[in-house]
């Protein structure tokens, strides 16, 4: 499957290029960077320090998408919406690992998915999606009157959105387990005099610092006992390989908006 990597000079863009070279089910077709990037016109090998790849870096989406079958996208919300539009028009698979979308932007992506196959997830790793599966089951088994749910995450100093897309994915799994809407029970932060904790609420707390790739814990706190389900990402390659697995899967599926739970066959297990 021929793929275009967008945001190719970012952390995940470089990881994706490296991962594609190591797989047989996908091949690198084009790499796209922001307008007037100093990388434009150079061989894509400069991004990963390898031998020549024979692919010139471009800042022109039309050029980047002209002969591709899919777009792999870890960029930012505004750019992802633009690429989703291209994908819908050209019937290209679109894999979205971007986070930080507003409700309106989420709705636009769902609309584009009527015309092409989109896989969108706050985290593309197998481990996190298995964790979400476990969180949903635990939330269903542990009643709100007996167990409080808190979600903690830490990322590197340069991450710009909070809570992370992964934390929200885990919060959504917990809310679904308890048959409630996350927006109705979500507590984003606590500061000053907050009063007692509301029964059934799902709290989020975030830390930023250093080069932490990603740490997430979901805490079920009851009387005299505490259950902690957690995941630590040690390399970004887990996200890249998950995204490429999603691309290969999406190629053979109908138009629609899917998640990594669909790709991994975990939705049926909830």
Swiss-Prot record:
Top-level EC class as recorded in UniProt: oxidoreductase
Annotated NADP(+) binding sites: 34
Sequence positions that bind NAD(+): 7-12, 97-99, 121-124
Origin superkingdom: Bacteria
Family matches, as InterPro entries: DapB_C, DapB_N, DapB_N_CS, DHDPR_bac, NAD(P)-bd_dom_sf
Pathway this chain belongs to: Amino-acid biosynthesis; L-lysine biosynthesis via DAP pathway; (S)-tetrahydrodipicolinate from L-aspartate: step 4/4
Subcellular location: Cytoplasm
Molecular function (Gene Ontology), one example: NADP binding
Gene Ontology CC, one term: cytosol
Binding residue positions for (S)-2,3,4,5-tetrahydrodipicolinate: 156, 165-166
Keywords associated with the record: Amino-acid biosynthesis, Cytoplasm, Diaminopimelate biosynthesis, Lysine biosynthesis, NAD, NADP, Oxidoreductase
Active site (UniProt): 155 (proton donor/acceptor), 159 (proton donor)
Protein EC: 1.17.1.8
Ranges in coiled-coil conformation: none
Biological processes annotated in GO: diaminopimelate biosynthetic process; lysine biosynthetic process via diaminopimelate
The reaction(s) this protein catalyses: (S)-2,3,4,5-tetrahydrodipicolinate + NAD(+) + H2O = (2S,4S)-4-hydroxy-2,3,4,5-tetrahydrodipicolinate + NADH + H(+); (S)-2,3,4,5-tetrahydrodipicolinate + NADP(+) + H2O = (2S,4S)-4-hydroxy-2,3,4,5-tetrahydrodipicolinate + NADPH + H(+)
Classification via SUPFAM superfamilies: Glyceraldehyde-3-phosphate dehydrogenase-like, C-terminal domain, NAD(P)-binding Rossmann-fold domains
Task performed by this protein: Catalyzes the conversion of 4-hydroxy-tetrahydrodipicolinate (HTPA) to tetrahydrodipicolinate.
PANTHER family linked: 4-HYDROXY-TETRAHYDRODIPICOLINATE REDUCTASE 1, CHLOROPLASTIC-RELATED, DIHYDRODIPICOLINATE REDUCTASE
Family affiliation: Belongs to the DapB family.
Record's protein name: 4-hydroxy-tetrahydrodipicolinate reductase
Species whose genome carries this gene: Bartonella tribocorum (strain CIP 105476 / IBS 506)
